[in-house]
Amino acid sequence: IAEFTMMGILPYVATDLGISIPVAGHFISAYALGVCFGAPMLLLARKRPLKQILLVLMALMIVGNICASMAPDYWVLLLGRFVSGLPHGAYFGVASIVAGKLADKGKSSEAVSIMIAGMTVANLFGVPLGTSLSHTLSWRATFLLVGAWGLITLYYIWRWVPQVEGLKDTGFKGQFRFLKKPAPWLILGATALGNGGVFCWYSYINPMLTNVSGFSAESITPLMILAGFGMVVGNLISGRLSDRYTPGKVGTAAQALICIMLL
């Protein structure tokens, strides 16, 4: 929710802070920049217990969103978004390892997809809820909601996630050894281009639907629920298929489907 909620409330934030929608888009970029800077933090914490890392990262997310909810101006909100983005990549990386290790034999891909489904469920329920809160109350209530949900998640991690053995430490340089092969670069490139293309339009989905497509402000919530539903279904299906077929085949089929739908 912390990542995607800004897309639905962008016009409300821009109006309240007295800035244009393109300038308000910097808050999305700040989060993404935090993700880029935060992911390498795993290199420094690679010897720490995985559960401890998850707790620290979740606490950092809570701080960032509480800061965003109380931001009096553009710069403080920009800082809050950056801080809340710092744990994003590292959190999903560690959580994927934990999910894979806790899964039954042959079910690791499905387990990871269920964990990642939290991000798609956020699009199904969290983002529309944030949009509705901003429309009826205030955009600040949305970030307060994310912070409160983070506190609940923090408790559940502490209470229910067992201590899991991490991956074998190969040293600082060993973390980059896989980049000597071309396959990781192709995956990184495809991910960058794919996500970049999605965020080019999804970041401004609210003003595009209202100002360009002519939808009313009240219709944004159900439209975003529909988009989120598609993400949830696609994520769950791909997780099951990845345990049966090679990732290359699943990825190729998914990209082909996207191209067909765009046509």
Question: Where would I find each of the regions flagged by the language model?
Answer:
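Extracytoplasmic
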Residues: 1-24, 39, 201-206
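Helix-breaking motifs and short loop linkers at transmembrane-helix boundaries and internal kinks
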Residues: 18, 70-76, 214, 246
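Helix-to-loop junctions at the C-terminal end of transmembrane segments
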Residues: 38-50, 234-246
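Structural signature of the two symmetry-related core transmembrane helices
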Residues: 52-67, 249-263
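Paired small-residue
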Residues: 64-67, 75-84
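Helix-loop-helix hairpin linking two adjacent transmembrane segments in secondary transporters
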Residues: 74-76, 105-106, 110-159, 204, ...
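Cytoplasmic helix-loop-helix junction between adjacent transmembrane helices
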Residues: 80-118
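Extracytoplasmic gate region of multi-pass secondary transporters
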Residues: 185-225
